[in-house]
Amino acid sequence: MKQALRVAFGFLMLWAAVLHAEVRIEITQGVDSARPIGVVPFKWAGPGAAPEDIGGIVAADLRNSGKFNPLDRSRLPQQPATAQEVQPTAWSALGIDAVIVGLVTPNPDGSYNVAYQLVDTGGAPGTVLAQNSYKVNKQWLRYAGHTASDEVFEKLTGIKGAFRTRIAYVVQTNGGQFPYELRVSDYDGYNQFVVHRSPQPLMSPAWSPDGSKLAYVTFESGRSALVIQTLANGAVRQVASFPRHNGAPAFSPDGTKLAFALSKTGSLNLYVMDLASGQIRQITDGRSNNTEPTWFPDSQTLAFTSDQAGRPQVYKMNINGGAAQRITWEGSQNQDADVSSDGKFMVMVSSNNGQQHIAKQDLVTGGVQVLSSTFLDETPSLAPNGTMVIYSSSQGMGSVLNLVSTDGRFKARLPATDGQVKSPAWSPYL
């Protein structure tokens, strides 16, 4: 946790939170079918009101995962603060087989101790399944809550939690000197800050695998350019500013390469830069347009969009040579893929019968499942644990961010009131 705190502290030191309206998750479908769980409000052991509702943060995280349905506080049969106070039968009678309790204690130095316990109320009643405590300053109380959520989520599902991650996105506001902003927030929309403001469009943010940098497209020079910005100090490195189009950056999982699309020779083609040397290699060639690269876990293979068969479809290709292989066959066109960190599936924008939705394709069987039901969906980005997808869609006259679970059962919106929100990118684990 200390390493993650240092990374996040670097963000806080350089940018104050945005005063504009932040995005917030609004669940639209699926929580009722999820596993019920009890999350008791964490007991506050200090004077006055608690500085943060840690239990509420944990409950929201678990609900937002789409895999849990925390019991409403008005229905809690008791409000214990420790495992010893939990009465398992009171919870099991409500179909609850696990309960989270906790305690927040102020320290003389101004810090806080946050402690939680995950208690079995089903198979082995009263057994403590997981527990931990953290000493944090006030600004890290939400982070402590997300940490507890990550640990509980992994204990109960076997899947690493992704509640301490962030999302990057572009907001286009109405008017002002800098109507385009690249922003970053916690995955749930809290702690939003601005990375870059521009009078011209910003596009396609992409995270480095260590979460320390963002690559993106800017038009501030009058034409498109690819840059990489270091979040800790704001330093900007220009990667590509060739004639015509420079776009669609994607860091390799090993952090040594950046793939992107250029049209300096006419058609769009894929290129890969070695980030240490700055050397650029052309990967695809020909008259077709090849763009929107995404990496497989081996850092040697790309999935990408190509119109070589007429309509856009997703192909894959080794960057060291060989022919491109088409991997999408369902629907009239498929594009803008994002491959999961284990390489077992990808999500993409799939169009069929005039509808444009987010779909998931199993890369072993080829099976395709449509996940979203919103309008003109685009730019899907997977959570690092592969359980959720964030994407943008059209709503009214603007665009908003949406979440959908990769099993398609859970859906939520992240609306913002101060502009159009698009081009989301989910961070790696931080």
UniProtKB/Swiss-Prot annotation:
One of its GO terms (biological process) is cell division. InterPro entries: 6-blade_b-propeller_TolB-like, PD40, Tol-Pal_TolB, TolB_N. Its main location: periplasm. The keyword Electron transport does not apply. Residues 1-21 form the signal peptide. The Tol-Pal system is composed of five core proteins: the inner membrane proteins TolA, TolQ and TolR, the periplasmic protein TolB and the outer membrane protein Pal. They form a network linking the inner and outer membranes and the peptidoglycan layer. Part of the Tol-Pal system, which plays a role in outer membrane invagination during cell division and is important for maintaining outer membrane integrity. TolB occupies a key intermediary position in the Tol-Pal system because it communicates directly with both membrane-embedded components, Pal in the outer membrane and TolA in the inner membrane. Belongs to the TolB family. This is Tol-Pal system protein TolB. The lineage of its organism: Bacteria, Pseudomonadati, Pseudomonadota, Gammaproteobacteria, Enterobacterales.
